[in-house]
Design a protein with these regions (language model features):
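Helix-to-loop junction immediately C-terminal to a conserved catalytic motif
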Residues: 48
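ABC ATPase NBD coupling module
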Residues: 64-78, 102, 219-223
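Conserved ABC ATPase signature
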Residues: 128-132, 136
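A short, proline-enriched helix->beta-strand linker immediately N-terminal to the Walker B motif
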Residues: 147-151
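Catalytic Walker B motif of ABC-type/P-loop ATPase nucleotide-binding domains
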Residues: 153-156
C-alpha cells in the first residue's frame, strides 16, 4: 500500500511550541534532523498517537490519524524507539508474533520466518526476552514492528548505543524491507550518517520549527541556518 503522510501538528511545550507541517510521499523515506530537544521526537509522537497534538491533523493516505477516529493500536503504524519495550513475560517468538496470532496463515508464517532468518534470531527464538542481550533485543523489536507489515514506519533513534557493525546490519535489513514492502518511513536520528543511509530527503528542525527540507546534497551545500551548518560540519 502506497500511503502518503500529510502532517500539520502543533504541540505546546514548556520551552517552546512545536509547529510542523510537511508531507512525505508514499513509499519514500524522510529524516528529521536537529539538536537534542529540538522537537523531533514530539513530532513523531504526535504522528504515532502516543501524544495528542494541541491542534492540527495527521493523515496517512485516506486515513485520518488525528483527530483520532479509531484506537491507536489499530493504526497501520510501526513505531520503534531507543527502548525495545519487549514484554518480559513472553519469549522472543511470542513478542514478535504478538497481535498477529489470529492471522496464523501460511503467508504469515513465511513472513515471520523471513524476519527470523534475516535478523539472525533463530538461536534465541524460544528464549525469554529478559535473558537476551541489548543488541538482540533491538533485533527482536525491529522484527516485531515489521511483523504486521505497517504502512508507516516511525523510527526514533532506535540505533543509539549500538556498535557500528550491528547498526549496518539493521540498516541493511531495514533498507531491504523498505524497498520490498513499500512502506512510508519517517526517521529521527542525531547521526547524519544513519539518516543519509535511509532517507533521500530530510527535514531540519530547530526549536520546534522546520528550517529546511531538502535532499542531503542540498543540506550540506546550502544549510539554511548557522546551527545547521555546525551540525553538518565534519568533526
Amino acid at each position: 500500500v502506497n500511503c502518503a503522510l500529510d502532517a500539520n501538528v502543533a504541540k505546546v511545550r514548556k520551552d517552546f511550541t512545536v509547529e510542523a507541517a510537511f508531507q512525505v510521499a508514499g513509499g519514500t523515506a524522510c529524516g528529521l534532523f536537529g539538536v537534542s530537544g529540538a522537537g523531533k521526537s514530539t513530532i513523531l509522537s504526535c504522528i504515532a498517537g502516543t501524544e495528542q497534538p494541541d491542534r492540527g491533523y495527521v493523515r496517512l493516505g485516506e486515513l485520518t490519524l488525528f483527530p483520532p477516529a479509531f484506537p491507536v493500536y489499530l493504526r497501520p503504524i510501526g513505531y520503534l524507539t531507543q527502548d525495545p519495550y519487549l514484554f518480559p513475560h513472553l519469549n522472543v517468538a511470542q513478542n514478535i508474533c504478538f497481535g498477529i496470532a489470529e492471522h496464523n496463515g501460511a503467508a504469515d508464517k513465511i513472513w515471520i520466518n523471513e524476519l527470523r532468518d534475516r535478523l539472525q534470531l533463530d538461536s534465541i527464538w524460544r528464549a525469554p526476552s529478559y535473558a537476551i542481550s541489548g543488541g538482540q533485543a533491538r533485533r527482536v523489536a525491529l522484527a516485531r514492528m515489521l511483523a504486521r507489515k505497517p504502512n508507516l514506519v516511525l523510527l526514533d533513534e532506535p540505533f543509539t548505543g549500538l556498535d557500528r557493525h550491528l547498526v549496518r546490519e539493521l540498516l541493511d535489513a531495514l533498507g531491504h524491507w523498505h524497498k520490498t514492502l513499500g512502506f512510508t518511513m519517517l526517521v529521527v536520528d542525531h547521526e547524519s550518517e544513519v539518516l543519509e543511509r535511509l532517507c533521500p530527503q530530510t527535514i531540519a528542525i530547530e526549536a520546534g520549527r522546520i528550517v529546511q527540507q531538502a535532499a542531503w546534497s542540498e543540506l550540506r551545500a546550502n544549510p539554511a541556518t548557522p546551527l545547521l551548518a555546525q551540525l553538518l560540519a565534519p568533526l
